[in-house]
Amino acid sequence: MPQTLSASDMVTPGSLSPPPTEPTDGEQAGQPLLDGAPSSASLETLIQHLVPTADYYPEKAYIFTFLLSSRLFIEPRELLARVCHLCIEQQQLDKPVLDKARVRKFGPKLLQLLAEWTETFPRDFQEESTIGHLKDVVGRIAPCDEAYRKRMHQLLQALHQKLAALRQGPEGLVGADKPISYRTKPPASIHRELLGVCSDPYTLAQQLTHVELERLRHIGPEEFVQAFVNKDPLASTKPCFSDKTSNLEAYVKWFNRLCYLVATEICMPAKKKQRAQVIEFFIDVARECFNIGNFNSLMAIISGMNMSPVSRLKKTWAKVRTAKFFILEHQMDPTGNFCNYRTALRGAAHRSLTAHSSREKIVIPFFSLLIKDIYFLNEGCANRLPNGHVNFEKFLELAKQVGEFITWKQVECPFEQDASITHYLYTAPIFSEDGLYLASYESESPENQTEKERWKALRSSILGKT
């Protein structure tokens, strides 16, 4: 089974309507993919597809796909400036006298586009200059209907609230990236362990789901593109995604922390009966995560139990009823590109689409596999074709994968938060890898010369003993 992951581990080197205008510069757009959307076109043509008119509005799928992928070729603030300029130019909004009938048909479409953009990609509007573009273009149509100005005020208010929530972020992982070294096992009477905080597997699975959804909520769709797709070589602008993946990185750290927390909780008890009890508890938690649709926590728990310091505890595992664990391992088996997991994920996705309750809507994918799928999609297809056109067909597939994730992450968690449990999950000390090995050797003595030598080295370096 996979071990814990870092962002570098995840990535190794190696229905739409046409706008009313024709392709520019005499170009011929590629063959349509869906209802008039070109499979490839110049960036200018794709931008034109985004711009509404009095008689045309781009379909929602096109808006999301282009706004997601366009940042590979043009920075969002520049794209917004271009869109606003085209709106002003095409609708003649710079004239002293406006065609009010025409503007009244165009205005709602412009506001709808801006609403969709700010709702889905709020981080594109963090700079004051982008807000200035919004106010300028809406200010030009406001004389035709004061409702436009009111709608703009509501839009900006919602945007500011969204940005404020994103800046606040989820609860931090205190010390998550700095595991402690093993010193000595504290007496059971004073050691605070997870089972002392929560002894019910279903409750812990619910709280893990609460944590997962809270952290997922802060990941913007643009982070997938910014983190895992190379900068377009034909673009003249500087890379626009160097430091814009903090929420994605934090989510990877959370997965790693949960792996190490599981291993730490198993290795900590002094008696094998207690260790076996903890293992069986986590097996039940993992099963409940599977039933809920929380595959990310499920994989983290399985990965933690499969870490070498845990898996070597043969005397402990001999006391564990492992039938349920083997079933879960089979579900998450990487064989066949995780075919068993992918089948289960499709089942959970179907359940979510037909859900009658909020609990049935939950789908939390195994995140690192989602990232790898997106990465290999990018690696397998060029961003541009030999003629310089943008490979829009590729980005439709990218948007399909990211869009599904966005739908899942927007589900409201139906479980009430238990602050004491989530605080423990975030802050409980975890062993480093060396600490886990030492705790494991202290629990069950080394069985071969290699283990004996490692145990001796760890006792010397960590405990100062020979």
Curated annotation (Swiss-Prot):
Residues 200-446 form the Ras-GEF domain. Residues 1-37 are annotated as: Disordered. Gene3D superfamilies: Ras guanine-nucleotide exchange factors catalytic domain, Son of sevenless (SoS) protein Chain: S domain 1. GO terms for molecular function: guanyl-nucleotide exchange factor activity. One of its GO terms (cellular component) is plasma membrane. Residues 34-164 form the N-terminal Ras-GEF domain. Keywords: Guanine-nucleotide releasing factor. It holds the Pfam family RasGEF. One of its GO terms (biological process) is Ras protein signal transduction. The keyword Transmembrane helix does not apply. Guanine nucleotide exchange factor (GEF). This is Ras-GEF domain-containing family member 1C. It comes from Homo sapiens (Human). The lineage of its organism: Eukaryota, Metazoa, Chordata, Craniata, Vertebrata.
